[in-house]
Amino acid sequence: MPKMKSVKGAVKRFKVKKSGKIKRGTAYRSHILTKVDGKHHRQMRSSKHVDTVDAKNIKEMIN
């Protein structure tokens, strides 16, 4: 049986950390950010972690 291919879009969007948690970027950061206040804009800069409910599916897509 052949190996499962990883989903390339998921590989580009997510990184698995040493602890096993999955790191992701923040949404709504592509354009029209002049309307967003400074505090929200700064908070969106930092990366987030994927929820444990979604982590299993994402790990299957990556591996």
Curated annotation (Swiss-Prot):
GO terms for molecular function: structural constituent of ribosome. This is Large ribosomal subunit protein bL35. Belongs to the bacterial ribosomal protein bL35 family. The keyword DNA-binding does not apply. It holds the Pfam family Ribosomal_L35p. PROSITE patterns: RIBOSOMAL_L35. The keyword Ribosomal protein applies.
